[in-house]
């Protein structure tokens, strides 16, 4: 499972209707990790710990399906699996044959059967995990991953682990720590930061190619190793987020955010009759967007398809 802009080809009719394909649902606004790089620590948000109740989830999810959403991602915000109603929520999704995925730190064991379960691991031992995620939980997460796949269970769920790469040395160490696990993919991601402030132009031209080359060398002997597509988008700065329509993100109160990386920009509420119109008309400051982000490549496709083309009758 991967975020892939080519998936948009399967939804060509939506370029006209501009109705969302994927929904990101924040089940909580609190977390059991303390990651220093967390997107949601950058912004000043409303205080107080909150979670989406089961009844509210069913109401919001039903509304999303009415709007045409095809897939749901349980994410945050906070850590989705520590929502007290998490098991009831996933049971409802599965009983209604709704395709969904989970982004989690997996500090708490859960036993659902989503399309994918992506574990943000980021460390290769207890100390590196504590340094990157603020708590001692590495061994617990590894055991939870093993337990999830024990006795041949959940073979229809695409199970993966990922790391946000900071330096060359950790690439090999991370791989050595997870290569024996029964996972379907091992993802190496770049840092996502406001207008790419984490990387200088020199980093993109010199350091990043060294990192990606090393990741690719590992992938040659282990097909599970994935070089995240965002590595190739570090020098792409869209002029506008024309592909924002492809996703819709709601927080634990049902508020629609402009996107999952901008929780401070509230467009309206998912129950508003005109919420898609409000979202289409909302203006965001692109200079405060993350570069790269999941929609970077989709924005390139949107821009290409929006351009007038001469002699398009000849293919």
For each feature predicted by the language model, list its residue ranges.
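Flexible mid-to-C-terminal extensions adjoining Fe-S/redox cofactors in radical SAM and related proteins
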Residues: 1-19, 41, 253-315
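Conserved alpha-helical substructure of the radical SAM core
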Residues: 1-116, 203-207, 300, 306, ...
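Short secondary-structure boundary/capping segments
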Residues: 15, 109, 151, 239-240, ...
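Short, solvent-exposed beta-strand edge segments and adjacent coil->beta transition regions
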Residues: 20-22, 158-160, 290
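Generic structural signal for small/hydrophobic residues in well-ordered secondary structure
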Residues: 27, 31-32, 53, 79, ...
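Radical SAM enzyme [4Fe-4S]-AdoMet core and its adjacent flexible, acidic
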Residues: 47, 66, 87, 99, ...
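Residues within well-ordered alpha-helical secondary structure of globular protein domains
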Residues: 63, 92-95, 147, 180, ...
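Short, well-ordered turn and helix-capping elements at secondary-structure junctions
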Residues: 78, 104-106, 133, 231, ...
């Amino acid at each position: 499972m991967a975020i892939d802009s080519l998936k948009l080809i399967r939804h060509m009719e939506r370029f006209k209707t501009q109705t969302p394909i994927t929904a990101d649902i924040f089940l909580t606004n609190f977390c059991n990790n303390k990651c220093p790089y967390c997107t949601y620590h950058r912004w000043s948000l409303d205080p107080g710990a909150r979670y989406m109740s089961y009844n509210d989830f069913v109401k919001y999810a039903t509304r999303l399906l009415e709007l045409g959403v095809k897939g749901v991602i349980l994410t945050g915000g906070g850590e989705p699996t520590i929502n007290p109603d998490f098991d009831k929520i996933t049971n409802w999704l599965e009983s209604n044959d709704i395709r969904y995925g989970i982004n989690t730190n997996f500090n708490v064991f859960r036993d659902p059967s989503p399309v994918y379960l992506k574990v943000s691991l980021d460390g290769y031992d207890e100390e590196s995990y504590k340094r990157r995620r603020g708590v001692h939980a590495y061994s617990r997460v590894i055991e939870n991953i093993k337990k999830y796949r024990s006795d041949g269970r959940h073979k229809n769920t695409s199970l993966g682990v990922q790391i946000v790469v900071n330096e060359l040395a950790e690439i090999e160490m991370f791989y050595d720590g997870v290569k024996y696990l029964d996972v379907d993919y091992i993802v190496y991601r770049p840092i996502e930061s406001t207008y790419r402030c984490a990387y200088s132009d020199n980093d993109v031209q010199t350091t990043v190619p060294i990192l990606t080359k090393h990741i690719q060398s590992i992938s040659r002997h282990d097909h599970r190793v994935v070089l995240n597509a965002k590595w190739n988008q570090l020098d792409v700065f869209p002029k506008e987020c024309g592909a924002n329509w492809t996703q819709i993100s709601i927080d634990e109160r049902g508020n629609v955010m402009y996107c999952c990386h901008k929780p401070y920009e509230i467009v309206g509420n998912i129950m508003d009759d005109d919420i898609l119109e409000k979202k289409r008309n909302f203006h965001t400051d692109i200079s405060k967007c993350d570069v790269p982000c999941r929609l970077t490549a989709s924005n390139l496709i949107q821009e290409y398809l929006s351009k007038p083309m001469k002699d398009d009758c000849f293919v």
